[in-house]
Amino acid sequence: MADLDDIKDGKDFHTDKPQTNTLFALKGCGALDWGMQSRLARIFNPKTRKTVMLAFDHGYFQGPTTGLERIDINIAPLFEYADVLMCTRGILRSVVPPAINKPVVLRASGANSILTELSNEAVAVAMDDAVRLNSCAAAAQVYIGSEHEHQSIKNIIQLIDAGLRVGMPIMAVTGVGKDMARDQRYFSLATRIAAEMGAQIIKTYYVDKGFERIAAGCPVPIVIAGGKKLLEREALEMCYQAIDQGASGVDMGRNIFQSEDPVAMIKAVHAVVHHNETAERAYELFLSEKG
């Protein structure tokens, strides 16, 4: 039985002050459950509402591509500088130290390779395994306009439904159908469809003309893919323009880990995303940090 002899009656209830609720003001997340908002708050810095994701999931269809031959040697030194790690469960379990304590966006689609039709994907991770791995989100490709468009949308819907049951955000990644142009109209279509299906984050490509319309027409946060390797100055300019036009962050791989100095590059990207540095100033930072 509890000892009640020394219990004191509470008196300081501040009855003159109504309870306040602190909102996490991330685009499109106001109606989400607490657990999902909590995961999103680990992905997106609550102060800047931006993120720098380090993508090294390419091996799920490309194999050991340049820069990813040895994750433990080439990629692990970058972990501490990233806000979020994006990888497959195989790499997460075999290479990523649990003590690194970084939020993970788990690649959850697969079953294809560069030798076959890329859009022919399936859900490759059960949601209970994503939870078991303490993931903060799961990601899958959606191929609007491709041969397997219907299946890729079904994959996203399946993951979204499973994610809602456990409070797991889903990031839809817009793969490009082979007959579709990489322009504002296509990415406005693809990002909006994925958001309408219920994805909480969209990963897409930056385009020079009309990106602000893509971002404005998407009701949830957009992060841009790095895409093919660019010169460092060009990659930083792309980052700056995307953030300036409404992106909520970047999910970069090759433009970081294939850089002349990956650590210096991710620091420069961080400066653009979280501190609103121009591409020019970020490039100066890259040069000063370069080993």
Curated annotation (Swiss-Prot):
SUPFAM superfamilies from the UniProt entry: Aldolase
Record localization: Cytoplasm
SMART domains, per database record: DeoC
Membrane-spanning residues: none
Cellular component aspect of the GO annotation: cytoplasm
InterPro entries the record matches: Aldolase_TIM, DeoC/FbaB/LacD_aldolase, DeoC/FbaB_aldolase, FbaB-like, LsrF
Enzyme Commission number: 2.3.1.245
UniProt keyword annotations, A-Z: Cytoplasm, Schiff base, Transferase
Name assigned to this protein: 3-hydroxy-5-phosphonooxypentane-2,4-dione thiolase
Species of the source: Salmonella paratyphi B (strain ATCC BAA-1250 / SPB7)
